[in-house]
Amino acid sequence: MSKTRVYELAQQMGIDNKELMARLADAGVSVKNHMAVLEDSDIKALSAPAQTPHKEVSQEEVRVKPTLIRRRAKAVEPEAASAEAASAPAAQEEAPQKAEPEKVEAEKAEAPKPRQAAEPVRARIIEAAPVPKPAAAPAEAAKPEKAKPAEPAPVAAAPKAAEAPAAPAAEAAPAAPAPAEAPVAKPAAKLEASAPAAPAAPAAAAPVEAQAPAKAEEQEPEKATPTRARILGRVEIPIPAQRPAERREYQRTAPGERPAPRPGMPRGVERPGTERPAPRPGGPRPAGAPGRPGERPTTGRPGGPTGGRPDRPAPLAPIDAPPLLGDDRRKGRKPAPAGGTDYAKNGKKGAPAAAGKGKKDSFKDILDKRERVFEPGPRSKGRKGKYEKVQIGKKTEITVPKAIKRIIKISESITVGELAKRMGIKATDLIRALMKLGVMATINHPLDFDTATLLATDFGYEIENVALDVDEILEAEPDTPESLLKRPPVVTIMGHVDHGKTSLLDAIREANVIAGEAGGITQHIGAYDVELNGKKITFLDTPGHEAFTAMRARGAKVTDIVILVVAADDGVMPQTREAVNHSKAAGVPIIVAINKIDKPDASPGKVKQELMEFGLVSEEWGGETIFVEVSAKKRINLESLLEMVLLQADVLELRANPDKPARGTIVEAKLDKGRGPVATVLVQEGTLKSGDYFVAGVHYGRVRAMQNDRGEKVLAAGPAMPVEVIGFNGVPDAGDIFVAMGDEKQAKEIANHRQMKLRESELAKHSKLSLEQLYEKIQKGEVKDLNAIVKGDVQGSVEAVAESLRKLSTDAIRLNVLHASVGAITETDVNLASASNAIILGFNVRPEVKAAALAEKEGVDVRLYNIIYDAVDDIKKAMEGLLEPTFKEKYLGRAEIREVFSVPKAGMVAGSYVTDGKIVRNAQVRLLRDNMVVYEGKLGSLRRFKDDVKEVATGYECGMSLENYNDLKIGDIFECFEMEKVAGKL
């Protein structure tokens, strides 16, 4: 099924889009605008002939192309004439009804008629179809009403034997009664007679004459040849004179008739003898086919009433139109604009246009048509208002996207440039809108969801947040009561440093872990599995040093029971208080283990009393807290402590579902040189198996292997079981949630999303200085920076060291941890330190050979530590070295002026007596007069009995002079002092 748009059909017919839409509306075909698509059925409805019986008798249809139907008449000339005569009487009966409203047109048309100059226009049309006048008169009188129904059809029918003769008559009949018709026909006949004189006239007339449809078929291929254009050109200068009159007639149509096309559209008149393609073949030709006997003289070109409306359809359907339509299709519909422009040009300039010029001006004609389509002009005033509204609405439809396209999906943030691209506007417009909101932005400036929504609303768009909802994806599934099974308790040992936490755990595990810790203090979280009487207990050992607060907080969060270790000889200490607070914040029950009871100065009662301040009251004293007195060294009461742990676990009724994907917590993580990133994972629910995909923080991976705290390989880890997992793509942070995933793609997507969010938050922290901040910085003096790179053996230690260093920052000096990671010191770290003037701190790690050589070459300070105390102290000293030293005044002594002498070349010299301290040469001195400072400067000379001396002690006399000052008087006091440098302190 072929589909043709309204504007294409209008171009083929050579009429205005509005007029075609009006015809379609009259034919019952509803179209919204000139871009609407017409089906074949719509075109047939539009082109339905007024005299259907004649169509059936006289024509046969042949489909030449999907979009072209060629109708050919079966009858010969005599048949056409007889059909014409037959239709005339019927038309004559109806003519009187229409004649009255169209008399006005007749009167208007008759005024220009005497001007013979205008008649060649008709002559051109008639020239193609010289017909006996007697036949025309009755036809003209007969056809007005029959032709009217066919008028709305923009598509002219191919040659119709019966209908074609009737149509030309229709044009003439509305014009006026027969008397008006006669004068018109006579000049036409005269011109007709003169036309053959031209050499090309016979060639043109013969095909158009078309007394039989067969002739019309023969002439069809010739329609596209230049001879047609030359025939048009042969119309002499009289055309210009008639053209304006015709235009006026077009504009002043009778109220009952549809408005004529604007003057720029004379293509319809010109079509019979030009290259102008006929409209779609299926349409009726209200004006009749050219060449019908007796019809041509009445073609309403000269007649006013006829020239208004009916005149237009006549040229739309010349007999030879179908071939031209084919040519038009092949040539991109250029012939139609060419012919019409040619005629318009003749009308304006008064000179016949050559065939070549017609083609040259086709582009202008196209532009003219576009103006009529898109810009309602003064000639559209007479049209129905609804068509103009359609045109205005059409502009809005073209410029405003559909509602579904006005929704922009973003993932939490979007750059200005990307937002502008998606909205189809310029980025500068968005930047201008942001500036109005007080935001100075560039094209790459990221916009958050709220700002983007605010901006998009101003431009008529909506923003939809399609960010990945990680929390929803990782949300734990609720467990049914029957799926929950009993699990071992997770116990965390907490307390102050050196109170015996690790020793107690070693005694329980019968191992010697503390021997492996540097300085005898724990600097890692350790996870261990202990079995007592067939029951398992999982222990987490946390550091007690103040720097490991985060580790203790993590330990308290993932645990079920906390064992608070307090030394009986030391009592409650700062980290003991902190451990109690962490446990209470996590809502975890506390069992107090009073350690070192074997020491002579042990005082368990004192410990119980101190802990009462924190609400930990012993059961012996009527409280609810379990206290157990133990000795890790002597292994006293260890079993009693474990029994209390199991008892507390039974009270808590600890249960978990092992038949689900594993979830847990990263207890500790490190970078192993042989195995890569390794993390200690405490499984809290579900079962972790080898081969499972997982995500932990910004890292993901697949479980390659697992082993327990004793180094044994494990294939599956159930709830409350700590295991070392190998298979991470990076070293995760301690405390990250570990979640087993169904596939690697989902795990990777979540990890990448978290990585992007982390990067955005880090960028937000490093904001640029504003002018006000910069001014304050200048006023106070530039802040000193000490950059550091921290490397450690495990993630927890690195985190603790970095946090301790950050706490050393002051207003005067700021410590920046540029990079903190797990693993040995590499060349990359040295290069970073060299570029940023940073020092490298290694905690329980050593530099690689190449890295050490590079550090020595670049002069990078690499410091290695095993104990966190030493690292913090060294950094503190380094920071103090960056501080500006302060100066302190040191008092030396006083001397009183007893006499003043004038010495040539030396100026005034004061004979003085040292009353206090000592006077030192080259020291700073103040001259006091009545306890007021008169002068402060440097001592010029110091002599005793004409000898220069370094200093003069109390009770001795001396001579002194000041540099560049001679106003000395008896009784003045010299106060001697010096300025000492004092190193800055944090």
UniProtKB/Swiss-Prot annotation:
Compositionally biased region (Basic and acidic residues): 53-64, 95-113, 215-225, 268-278, 358-374
Protein name, entry field: Translation initiation factor IF-2
Residue segments, region G2: 520-524
InterPro entries associated with the record: EF-G-like_DII, IF2_II, IF2_N, P-loop_NTPase, Small_GTP-bd, T_Tr_GTP-bd_dom, TF_IF2_bacterial-like, TIF_IF2
Annotated spans, G3: 541-544
GO MF annotation terms: GTP binding; GTPase activity; translation initiation factor activity
Location of region: G4: 595-598
Top-level taxon of origin: Bacteria
Region (G1): 495-502
Main location: cytoplasm
Annotated gene: infB
Positions of the UniProt region annotated as Disordered: 47-388
Keywords, ordered alphabetically: Cytoplasm, GTP-binding, Initiation factor, Nucleotide-binding, Protein biosynthesis
Protein role: One of the essential components for the initiation of protein synthesis. Protects formylmethionyl-tRNA from spontaneous hydrolysis and promotes its binding to the 30S ribosomal subunits. Also involved in the hydrolysis of GTP during the formation of the 70S ribosomal complex.
Any one Gene Ontology cellular component term annotated for this protein: cytosol
Metal-binding keyword on record: no
